[in-house]
Amino acid sequence: MKDCEERQRAAAPSRILVMCIREALKGQCAEIKRRADKAASIGREDNMNFESARANMVDNQLRTTDVTSHSVLTAFLTVPREAFVPEKAKPLAYIDRDVEICPAAAGKPARYLMQPSPLAKLLQLAAVTKDDVVLEIGAGSGYVSALFSQIAGTVVAVEEDETLAAEAKANLANYTNVSVVTGSLNAGNPSGAPYDLIFISGSVEEVPSSLLSQLRDGGRLVTVQGYGGSARAKVFVSERGTISENVYFNASVKPLPGFAKAREFVF
């Protein structure tokens, strides 16, 4: 009996040590779980913030500038704008301003994701239907084509910058009705013509005939022509071989490279 009591006393520290280890492990597990839950919560909060920002963009930037098209508003609510900007620019994705997606380099100008409010007005002006075949000029990172994918039948996006074209292809991988073509912006994509709509994602000094010739009879080209305060949103319509031009509203939009008017020399 005495031996048994001595063995129990000798074993007591070991049992206490085991219990301490168990409690410590429980504490570590609880801390790990707490941190994991917090990380997941932060992720959910980030998603909720983007969703909330998207809704605020529609309510406070688009509706307030007379964008009333249900299909256009739904497209802006559906497509995550933050997925089409660089990581460091994601907090700026839903501010009503242009967002730089490619810095200027080697003589090439910077490229931008268009400010939401003029972009939405231009898409509304385009009056896209589910049967339309759309050609976007200047795909950039793919955001505008993603919007068109929600309201058009087929979308072809042309981008001449190889880095941006690769980025657009990756961003649009799950948009099954969109294809990205790498090539000259002002050449368009004649192999896929004619198009119901050609949309130029940036302002231009002049619209080349090479693009207008790719319109279907009754098709239209939507763009912003001119720079700064003199820029106007325009729709060019092809009817029986004749192009008509209509001016709609002022729009300040970043220029797209390759559409400068040829300069005339005066002697």
PLM feature segments, named:
Residues 6, 81-84, 177, 220, ...:
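Generic structural signal for secondary-structure transition and capping sites
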Residues 7-9, 15, 22, 34-35, ...:
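Basic polycationic patches enriched in arginine
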Residues 29-32, 43-54, 195, 213, ...:
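SAM/dcSAM-binding transferase cores
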Residues 32, 42-133, 151, 164-166, ...:
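Class I SAM-dependent transferase core
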Residues 123-244:
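Conserved nucleotide-cofactor-binding alpha/beta core module
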